[in-house]
């Protein structure tokens, strides 16, 4: 099972970065409706088969976010 709530994670990271989802979509050259659809889709981020494989092996999945270092 995916332990993260992707929708909340993206919204929090947008707030931390001081941008909106619309601005995020613009910066990655896509639409805000597509960004919204991706983060709301339950199996859109992690492949369902991968989740089943990890569950069968006795694991849950937890994503961690590491801030990129600016040089």
Language-model-derived ranges and their functions:
Residues 65-71:
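Short amphipathic recognition helices of helix-turn-helix/homeodomain-type DNA-binding modules
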Residues 29-44:
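Recognition helix of helix-turn-helix/homeodomain-like DNA-binding domains
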Residues 24-25:
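Short alpha-helical "recognition helix" segments of helix-turn-helix
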Residues 1-17:
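A short, Lys/Arg-rich alpha-helix, primarily the initiator
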Residues 21, 32, 47-50:
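Helix-turn-helix DNA-binding elements, focusing on the entry/boundary residues of the two helices
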Residues 48-63:
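DNA major-groove recognition helix of helix-turn-helix/homeodomain DNA-binding modules
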């Amino acid at each position: 099972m995916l332990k993260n709530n992707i929708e909340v994670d993206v919204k929090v990271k947008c707030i931390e970065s001081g941008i909106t989802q619309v601005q995020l979509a613009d910066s990655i050259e896509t639409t805000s409706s597509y960004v919204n659809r991706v983060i709301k889709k339950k199996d859109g981020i992690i492949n369902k088969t991968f989740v089943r494989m990890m569950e069968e092996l006795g694991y849950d999945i937890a994503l961690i976010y590491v801030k990129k270092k600016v040089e």
